[in-house]
Amino acid sequence: MKYDGIVIYSDLDGTLLDAERNLSKENLDAINWFISQGGRFGVATGRMERTTDIMFPDLHLNVPSIFFNGAMAYDTSSGKVLFKTVISGDLKPVLKKFISEYPETCCEINIHGKAYVFNPNDILQTQLDREGILVEEARWEDIPGEWIKVLFMGDHGTLEKIKADFDKLGRTDLNIVFSEDDILDIMEKSASKGAALYKLKSMFGENWRLVVSIGDNDNDAELVQNADLGIAVGNATPAVKRVSDFIIKDHNTPCIPQVLELLESYL
């Protein structure tokens, strides 16, 4: 079939979704056409693994997808976790210090299927509305282990201070990156969308002749770079545009039809 062996991984927010966080009919139709012709489509997002089933039930994913900014690869069809990377070491003392110093900033701890929050704010509420995740305010001692990702949500300037505070602590074991202007993600150092794509290519590569990835934010740069064909949307950060092979229109213009047009010269 036309797209046999071709895999597309797309970021969600700022890429596949428009400025209102909507998934357009044009993108859905293009994805369904791509899959019907033998293609494989997955997402690579900072969101939890539940988000696509809850918020985008019509989105067909037929390849294991990348969640938590690369800390987990999850097959939404089978419910199988292919791999996950959890934060090692005890972050609780550091997080307690930061949520005390920055009380206006929300801290969220992601564990498989659930999240625990401190200092809930409006940005958290926006996240809950758009992602459909389950959160709980809990005591530190009641939070289980195997943390996949920690988020801070707040004013960008405050988040820059928190990032700088982590840098001062010399926490080289962590990967700290902005997934959005008002969200700072913290994961194990080895966890990234690009690293997850590399692992998936090593697992399925013999059946994948061309891997395409699309993104917009700094956390997508390695994903775009590690693809055979890396694409930045027009609203992408300079870091993503620098490593991309092509730059298409911004996320308010459906990206998948543009990608399929670009693919014509690779078939």
Feature annotation, model-predicted:
Residues 38-42, 62-63, 148-149, 209-210, ...:
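Short active-site oxyanion
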